[in-house]
Amino acid sequence: MLRAQGYAADKPIGMAAQQTPAYLAHAGIEQRLGQPLPMAAIFTDETGRTGPLSSWFSNKPVVMAEVYYQCAMMCPQVQHGLTTGLAQTTLKPGQDYQVLVMSIDTMDKPANAVDEKKTFLSEAGWTNNPAAGNAVHFLTSDQASIDAITSATGFHFVRVPGPDGKMDQFAHSSVIMFATPDGRMSKYLSGIDYPARDLRMALLQAGDKKISNPVDLLILYCCNYSPAVGRYSVSIVRILGIAGMITLVIVAGMIFLLTRKPKGLAPSVAGPALKS
């Protein structure tokens, strides 16, 4: 499980190490790859449109974030990391993928979702991009649907007290998730910084698209996805394997060139001996 990052787990600079609060043991991520999402669960988007989760799925992979809109700590960083990374990929929102940002707080309403979406589109440079506007949605819901989606995605969170003592904040992990077009969990990326390369590979895999770009093929082959850490990492064994095959081809080619007989040259025939 990827444990909670941020909130109470972060200590102010200079503060002595303290024991992690017991309630944080219940916050984290349990990666449920292949798990079907609750497509019948009811949500409401930033426009006020209400419908089953399937309403926001089509024939494209979906990148998802589970946050709460009134968060002033880690959630904005997760969304900023996502917008920055997506804007740097060559994939296009609406054409290649959809984005769903879902609130885990029943106090969040469509009005909050409107503001969050405006910020998201602005940070990605998509304010005047109609395709992006139609591909990015911020969802709110009741507790039953929130429980259904977070259970399916393995997103564990706990309500915790804020600075004023009110139980109006949440401890949770910083993570984004990827779902297949038919609504099954595909990948998780942890942290608050999501490199464009990682996002592109995760979306391509989630969409189960044919990999026709040689660069993508090489990267996917040279990289292992580690469910334990939620990151792509370079596999040294695979790189050495590729290097070994390339070396073998080069050596075989050199041997062939050095040993083949030149064409057009007849064998020499000894002529008559010269008389002195």
Identify the role of each PLM range.
Residues P52-L82, V99-V101:
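Short active-site neighborhood of thiol/selenol oxidoreductases, capturing the structured segment around
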Residues P36-P38, S58-P61, G94-V99, G133, ...:
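Extracytoplasmic
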Residues P21-L24, K109-L121, S141-Q169, K210-I211:
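Thioredoxin-like thiol-disulfide oxidoreductase module
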Residues S226-T247:
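Juxtamembrane/start-of-transmembrane alpha-helix segments at the extracytoplasmic/lumenal side
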Residues P12, A16, G162-C222:
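Extracytoplasmic/lumenal ectodomains and periplasmic regions of secretory and membrane proteins
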Residues Q79-I146:
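Structural microenvironment flanking redox-active thiols in thiol-disulfide oxidoreductases
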Residues M1-A40, T44, A252-K263, P272-S276:
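N-terminal targeting signals for export/organelle localization
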